[in-house]
C-alpha cells in the first residue's frame, strides 16, 4: 500500500527515467530548424566535427542532443522518415546501457540508428546483433544509405565468410551480424595461430535486437566449437535396437506403480531414469547382444561409456519427438529451435544425443565431437564494454536482465495508444474440441474479411491445424521450420483481407504484418515498375487496408500457452501496431503440455465441478489465474537453470579468460625465449625434486631413476652416477646447477643448427599447440566433472564449492603439464637443418586447417546445471600482475595463472 502511494506521488523509476530523457528530446526538437538549414555537405561534416571533439576529450554522452538531431535530419533526407519523439527516447535508453521495451511496429530498426551512430563516433566499432542472417542483411542494407550519407562504414558478418571479408566487416564503424556468428568468431580468434588470423577488434558496444530471445531464451545453450572424436556409430545402432523392448513407467510419482515400467520420464527436468526392473532387463539384453559379458553390471567402472550410450538412446526415444524437437530432411536430423520454431542447420546436440536420435531415425550416424572451445551467450555479451538491447517484451524478464547482465529495463511509451482487444482464454477438456473451436473462429473471422494469424508451439501442431483447415476448405499459408525460405514474404502478406497464416512460435519475428498486405513487396516483385504501376498498387493497397481496419484489424489465435508469458505477449504483439485495431485470443485444452505438467489436476477438478459438457469451453478468472501461476512456475524454474548455468560457467570463464589472455599475449610477441628459459628452470627443478628431495641425505637419492627420466622425457644422456663417483665434492645444489646447465648447452647447440630466428618461431608454435591440446583435454575433463558433481550433495557437500575447488586443482595441474610438455617437446625434437623446422611448421598448419574444416559449431542442450553463486561482472578487465588471481586460489595473478605471461 505504502509503495503504491509513494509511486503515485513520485512516479515509478521508469517514469522518472523517461522524465529525465524528455528534457533531452526537447533540446533535440529545438535544434531541428537549425539542422534543416544545413546543406547536405554541412550535415555530413558534422560526423568529423563530433569525432574531433571526442578526440579532444568530450564524452560521447555530451553529444547526444546534437548527434541525434543530425541522424534525424539525415533520415528525413535519405529515407523521408522522421524519428518520432518516442524513438529518440528509445535511442537514449539504448545508449544508457539499458533494455528498451518497444512494442511491435514502433520502429526499433530506425531507433537503433541513433545509438549506433553515436557510439560509432569513438572509432571503436559497434556490433548490432540480430537473431538470424536474413534480419542482419536486411537491416544492414536498409540502414546503409543513412550511415554512408553520414560518412560511416557498414559491415555485415555472415556465417561462412572468408577471414579477410570478416576482418573488413569488423573493421567497419557499424557491423551487423547474428549472436551465434559473433560468439563463434570470438572462439575462433582464440584458437588462431597468428595475429593475422584474428578477425574481431576489442569488444566495445553491442546493440542486441530481440534481446530477450538472445540473452534469455538462448542463454542455456553454450556455443561450442568441436572437432571429431573416435567413431562409435556401431554401438549407437546396437543399443538403439534394445530400447523398444523397454516400457515407460506411467505414474512416476506413485509408489504403488514402482515396479511396472522399465524407465521413468521427468518431463520438467527433461531426464530419463532406469528403474530397478529396467536395469535388470537392459543388462540381460546387452548380454544377449554380446555387448556386455555375463555377470557384469552396467554401473561398473568399465561400462561408463556403455551407460552413456544407453542414457542417450533412452532420451532420444522418450524425450525427443520428430517434427517437434527435430525434423529429418535429406537423410539428416536437423534440430528445431524450441523458441523460434526455426531449423538450426549445422547445429548438433552434444553428449551423444544427436547420434542416438540419428540411430533412432535410421539415418547415417555422424561421429561424436570433442569440445575445442565453448562459451555461453551470458559470458560472451558481458565481455563488451557497453551492452544494450531492445525488444517488444522485456518487462516480464526485467529482474533477470538486472541480476545477470546488470541491465535495467525501461518501457518506452507507444507513439499512438494501443487499442487491441485481448480476449480472455477459452479452455476445453480435449485437444480435438479445442481445434474444432479454432476452426469455427477462423471461419467466422475470415467471412468478415478479417485476416487471422494462428500461433502454434511446434511444427507438429501447425500441421494438425493445417490439415483441419484444408478439410474445412479454408485457404491458408503455413510458416514453420520446414518452409522457412519464404518466411518474410509470407509474413509480409499475412495482413491481406481474410488471409489465414499459421506460424510456429515466433517464426517471422522482425518482419511487420501490414494491414492489407505489403505494397512494397508487390512493387519489389515487378521488374522495373513504372510510376503508374506503383500508384495503382498503392491505391489497391489503400482499399484493402481500409477494408481490414473496418473488419477489426489482425486477429491473433494462440493454440496453446507457451512456457513463458513473454512469448505469448510476443504473439499478441503482432497485432495492434501503431494504434491499429486488432484482437487476440488463446485457446487451451487440458491435454496441452503446460496444463498437463503444471496445472492439470486442479483445473480439471474445477472444470468437472462446473459441470462441463463435451465441446463446451470455460472462461473463468480462476482458470486464467491457475494458468498464469503455472507459467510463473516454469519461468522461475527456467531462470534458476540459467542462473545456475551461468554460475557454473563463471568458474570455467575465469579459467577461459586467463588462458585466452595468455594465448593472445603469446600470439602478439615474436620472442618467447625468456618464458621458455623461465619454465625450463621450473620443470627441471620439479623433475630433480622427484628423485633428489630437497635437503635430503645422499642415501635417499634415486640417481638411476633420474637418469632414465632425463633420457626418456628430455632426450638427455647424463652420466650423473659417474659424476658423483669422480667428484665427491659435488653436492645437491651444484648437481642441480650442472644438470640445468647441460640441458641449456644441448638446446643451444640445436639452436645453432637452425638459427635463432627459426628457433624462436618454433618455440612459439610448440607453446601454442601444447596449450591448445591441453586446454581441449581440460575442457573434456571439466565436462565430466560437471556431469557428476551434483552427487556430492548426497555427502552433505556444496556441489558448487566442490566444482570450484576441483576445477581449480585441475587447472593448476594443467598449467604444470603445459610447462612440462613444452620443455619435453622442445628437448626431444631432433633438428638438423632449418628446412626441418619449416616442414614441422607446415605440418602443424595443415593439421590446424584440417581441424578447422571438420569443426562443428553447436548449441549444447544444457539443462542440468547445479546451483552456484558468483557475482556477475560486466566487461573484460585486464588482470594486473599483483591482482588476486581470478581462479580463486588466493594467490597473486603473477604467481598463479600469470606465470606464463
UniProtKB/Swiss-Prot annotation:
Function, as annotated: Part of the Sec protein translocase complex. Interacts with the SecYEG preprotein conducting channel. Has a central role in coupling the hydrolysis of ATP to the transfer of proteins into and across the cell membrane, serving both as a receptor for the preprotein-SecB complex and as an ATP-driven molecular motor driving the stepwise translocation of polypeptide chains across the membrane.
Q: Which GO terms describe its biological process?
A: intracellular protein transmembrane transport; protein import; protein targeting; protein transport by the Sec complex
Keywords, in A-Z order? ATP-binding, Cell inner membrane, Cell membrane, Cytoplasm, Membrane, Metal-binding, Nucleotide-binding, Protein transport, Translocase, Translocation, Transport, Zinc
Q: How would you classify this enzyme at the top EC level?
A: translocase
Native organism: Salmonella typhimurium (strain LT2 / SGSC1412 / ATCC 700720)
Query: Which InterPro entries does the entry mention?
Result: Helicase_ATP-bd, P-loop_NTPase, SEC_C_motif, SecA, SecA_CS, SecA_DEAD, SecA_motor_DEAD, SecA_preprotein_X-link_dom
What does the organism's lineage look like at the top? Bacteria, Pseudomonadati, Pseudomonadota, Gammaproteobacteria, Enterobacterales
Q: State whether it acts alone or in a complex, and with which partners, per the record.
A: Monomer and homodimer. Part of the essential Sec protein translocation apparatus which comprises SecA, SecYEG and auxiliary proteins SecDF-YajC and YidC.
Give the membrane topology, semicolon-separated if more than one: Peripheral membrane protein
Q: Which GO terms describe its cellular component?
A: cell envelope Sec protein transport complex; cytoplasm; plasma membrane
Please report the name of this protein according to its UniProt entry. Answer: Protein translocase subunit SecA
- Tell me which EC number(s) this protein carries: 7.4.2.8
What does the induction field say?
A: Repressed under conditions of excess protein secretion capacity and derepressed when protein secretion becomes limiting. This is regulated by SecM.
Protein encoded by which gene = secA
Which subcellular locations apply to this protein? Cell inner membrane; Cytoplasm
Q: Where does this protein hold ATP? A: 87, 105-109, 512
Amino acid at each position: 500500500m505504502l509503495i503504491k502511494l509513494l509511486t503515485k506521488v513520485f512516479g515509478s523509476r521508469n517514469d522518472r527515467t523517461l522524465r529525465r530523457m524528455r528534457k533531452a528530446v526537447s533540446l533535440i526538437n529545438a535544434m531541428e530548424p537549425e539542422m534543416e538549414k544545413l546543406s547536405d555537405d554541412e550535415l555530413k561534416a558534422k560526423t568529423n566535427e563530433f569525432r574531433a571533439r571526442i578526440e579532444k576529450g568530450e564524452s560521447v554522452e555530451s553529444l547526444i542532443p546534437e548527434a541525434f538531431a543530425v541522424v534525424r535530419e539525415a533520415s528525413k533526407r535519405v529515407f523521408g522518415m522522421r524519428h518520432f519523439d518516442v524513438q529518440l527516447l528509445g535511442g537514449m535508453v539504448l545508449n544508457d546501457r539499458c533494455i528498451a521495451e518497444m512494442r511491435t511496429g514502433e520502429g526499433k530498426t530506425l531507433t537503433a540508428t541513433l545509438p549506433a551512430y553515436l557510439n560509432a563516433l569513438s572509432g571503436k566499432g559497434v556490433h548490432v546483433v540480430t537473431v538470424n542472417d536474413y534480419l542482419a542483411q536486411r537491416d544492414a542494407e536498409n540502414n546503409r544509405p543513412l550511415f554512408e550519407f553520414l560518412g560511416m562504414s557498414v559491415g555485415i558478418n555472415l556465417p561462412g565468410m572468408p577471414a579477410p571479408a570478416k576482418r573488413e566487416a569488423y573493421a567497419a564503424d557499424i557491423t551487423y551480424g547474428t549472436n551465434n556468428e559473433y560468439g563463434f568468431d570470438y572462439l575462433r580468434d582464440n584458437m588462431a595461430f597468428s595475429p593475422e588470423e584474428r578477425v574481431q577488434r576489442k569488444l566495445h558496444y553491442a546493440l542486441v535486437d530481440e534481446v530477450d530471445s538472445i540473452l534469455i531464451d538462448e542463454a542455456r545453450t553454450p556455443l561450442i566449437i568441436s572437432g571429431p572424436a573416435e567413431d562409435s556409430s556401431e554401438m549407437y545402432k546396437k543399443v538403439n535396437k534394445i530400447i523398444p523392448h523397454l516400457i515407460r513407467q506411467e505414474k512416476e510419482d506413485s509408489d504403488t506403480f514402482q515396479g511396472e515400467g522399465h524407465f521413468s520420464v521427468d518431463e520438467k527436468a527433461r531426464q530419463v531414469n532406469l528403474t530397478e526392473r529396467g536395469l535388470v532387463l537392459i543388462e540381460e539384453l546387452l548380454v544377449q547382444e554380446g555387448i556386455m559379458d555375463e555377470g557384469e553390471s552396467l554401473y561398473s567402472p568399465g561400462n561408463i561409456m556403455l551407460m552413456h550410450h544407453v542414457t542417450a538412446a533412452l532420451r532420444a526415444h522418450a524425450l525427443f519427438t520428430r517434427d517437434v524437437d527435430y525434423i529429418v530432411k535429406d537423410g539428416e536430423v536437423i534440430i528445431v529451435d524450441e523458441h523460434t520454431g526455426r531449423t538450426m542447420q549445422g547445429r548438433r546436440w552434444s553428449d551423444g544425443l544427436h547420434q542416438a536420435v540419428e540411430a533412432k531415425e535410421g539415418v547415417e550416424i555422424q561421429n561424436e565431437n570433442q569440445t575445442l572451445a565453448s562459451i555461453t551467450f551470458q559470458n560472451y555479451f558481458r565481455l563488451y564494454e557497453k551492452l544494450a538491447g531492445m525488444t517488444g517484451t522485456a518487462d516480464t524478464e526485467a529482474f533477470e536482465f538486472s541480476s545477470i547482465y546488470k541491465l535495467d529495463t525501461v518501457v518506452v511509451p507507444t507513439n499512438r495508444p494501443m487499442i487491441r482487444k485481448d480476449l480472455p482464454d477459452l479452455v476445453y477438456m480435449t485437444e480435438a474440441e479445442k481445434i474444432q473451436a479454432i476452426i469455427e473462429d477462423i471461419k467466422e473471422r475470415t467471412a468478415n474479411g478479417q485476416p487471422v494469424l494462428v500461433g502454434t508451439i511446434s511444427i507438429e501442431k501447425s500441421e494438425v491445424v493445417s490439415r483441419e483447415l484444408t478439410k474445412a476448405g479454408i485457404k491458408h499459408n503455413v510458416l514453420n521450420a520446414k518452409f522457412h525460405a519464404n518466411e518474410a514474404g509470407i509474413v509480409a502478406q499475412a495482413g491481406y483481407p481474410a488471409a489465414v497464416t499459421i506460424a510456429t512460435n515466433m517464426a517471422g519475428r522482425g518482419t511487420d504484418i501490414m494491414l492489407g498486405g505489403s505494397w512494397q513487396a508487390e512493387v519489389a516483385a515487378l521488374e522495373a515498375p513504372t510510376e503508374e504501376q506503383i500508384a495503382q498498387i498503392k491505391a489497391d493497397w489503400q482499399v484493402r487496408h481500409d477494408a481490414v481496419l473496418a473488419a477489426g484489424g489482425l486477429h491473433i489465435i494462440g493454440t496453446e500457452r507457451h512456457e513463458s508469458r513473454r512469448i505469448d505477449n510476443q504473439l499478441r504483439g503482432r497485432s495492434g501496431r501503431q494504434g491499429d485495431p486488432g484482437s487476440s485470443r488463446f485457446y487451451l485444452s487440458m491435454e496441452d503440455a503446460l496444463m498437463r505438467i503444471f496445472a492439470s489436476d486442479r483445473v480439471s477438478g474445477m472444470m468437472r465441478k462446473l459441470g462441463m459438457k463435451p465441446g463446451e469451453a470455460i472462461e473463468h478468472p480462476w482458470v486464467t489465474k491457475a494458468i498464469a501461476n503455472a507459467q510463473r512456475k516454469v519461468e522461475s524454474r527456467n531462470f534458476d537453470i540459467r542462473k545456475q548455468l551461468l554460475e557454473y560457467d563463471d568458474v570455467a570463464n575465469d579459467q577461459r579468460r586467463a588462458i585466452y589472455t595468455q594465448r593472445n599475449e603469446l600470439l602478439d610477441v615474436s620472442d618467447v625465449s625468456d618464458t621458455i628459459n623461465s619454465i625450463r628452470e621450473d620443470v627441471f627443478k620439479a623433475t630433480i625434486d622427484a628423485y633428489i628431495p630437497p635437503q635430503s641425505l645422499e642415501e635417499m637419492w634415486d640417481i638411476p631413476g633420474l637418469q632414465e627420466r632425463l633420457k626418456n622425457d628430455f632426450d638427455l644422456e647424463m652420466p650423473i652416477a659417474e659424476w658423483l663417483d669422480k667428484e665427491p665434492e659435488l653436492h645437491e645444489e651444484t648437481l642441480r646447477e650442472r644438470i640445468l646447465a647441460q640441458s641449456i648447452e644441448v638446446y643451444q647447440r640445436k639452436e645453432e643448427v637452425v638459427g635463432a630466428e627459426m628457433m624462436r618461431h618454433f618455440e612459439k608454435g610448440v607453446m601454442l599447440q601444447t596449450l591448445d591440446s591441453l586446454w581441449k583435454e581440460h575442457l573434456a575433463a571439466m565436462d565430466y566433472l560437471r556431469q557428476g558433481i551434483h552427487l556430492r550433495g548426497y555427502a552433505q557437500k556444496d556441489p558448487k564449492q566442490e566444482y570450484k575447488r576441483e576445477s581449480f586443482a585441475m587447472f593448476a595441474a594443467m598449467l604444470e603439464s603445459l610447462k612440462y610438455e613444452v620443455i619435453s617437446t622442445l628437448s626431444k625434437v631432433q633438428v638438423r637443418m632449418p628446412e626441418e623446422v619449416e616442414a614441422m611448421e607446415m605440418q602443424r598448419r595443415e593439421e590446424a586447417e584440417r581441424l578447422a574444416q571438420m569443426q562443428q559449431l553447436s548449441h549444447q542442450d544444457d539443462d542440468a546445471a547445479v546451483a552456484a553463486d558468483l557475482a556477475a561482472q560486466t566487461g573484460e578487465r585486464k588482470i594486473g600482475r599483483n591482482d588476486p588471481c581470478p581462479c580463486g586460489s588466493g594467490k597473486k595473478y603473477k604467481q598463479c595463472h600469470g606465470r606464463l605471461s
